[in-house]
Amino acid sequence: MIDPALLRTFVVVARSGGFSAAARELGTRQSTVSGQVRRLEAQVGRRLLDRDSHRVELTSDGQALVGFAHEILDSIEVAENWFGGDELTGHVRFGVSEDIMTETFPDLLRQFWRQHPRVDLDLRVGLSENLHQQTRISQVDLAFIKRRPGERHGTLVFDDDLVWAGRESEPLGPGEPVPVVAYPPPSITRQAGLAALERAGLGHRISCVTDDLAGLRAAAIAGLGYIVHSRSLLPPPLVVVPHLPDPGRAEYVLVTRPGPRSRAVQALSDLILENAGPRRDGEVAS
């Protein structure tokens, strides 16, 4: 049997890169951490770390065990929450703007599931305006969406600059209309971009319309036109196009349907408010 307490210590050592740093994080002595790792190596019958005077490195078996350890510890947490008195149950219809579904947001969903394994989610991904309307008519319980600056609906989670982006930032020829790749109406980023072009007196043409995130990115990467994009979510190889007018900002908010919130909706809302923020690796704004 592998002791879960030893696995927890090993994961901290692997993450921090050394016994001293792990001991500080765990609030214990370095000798205690080192001894726990030796006990774990004895239990699995493999050497997990290469040690020197400055740092520890994972062996191939150590790298494998880190992956297993995360799965084991996650499963233990779910089981403890299931049997340990967390009686939160229910069904949440949860709407999410497509650009928020980044590599980091699934970690929030996983954290929620670990804490509340008896709550079922009906996940709906789409345009912010559509999800807002579905929330207003009680088709969605909770929505994590964008709004324009100055709008009042929802609870602010974070805001971000909008930028024009494309494969490369070469200037357009004189009088050449700006090629725009966009979602169909009522996309907030589409409206922000077209309004900025109109204010600047620049002509434009909608060179590609798609209601799919992958299609939007593919068209921009292929050079079909420029997109309006949240700055903190800009993925390579797309780059900011500085010669086009500023499309402004977007605010990311939580919106709930009218009426009282269920405990499950409140728990998910609290988790997002405490943990969500600007993304550095992500997708295109919708």
Question: Which residue stretches match the model-derived regions?
Answer:
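Conserved amphipathic alpha-helical core elements
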Residues: F10, L40-E41
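Short helix-boundary/capping micro-motifs
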Residues: V11-G27
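A short LG(V/I)-centered, amphipathic sequence patch enriched
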Residues: E41-L58
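Alpha-helical linker/hinge and terminal dimerization helices associated
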Residues: Q43-V44, L65-D86
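Central regulatory/effector-binding core of bacterial HTH transcription factors
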Residues: T89-G150, T210
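Secondary-structure junction motif
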Residues: P179-A200, S262
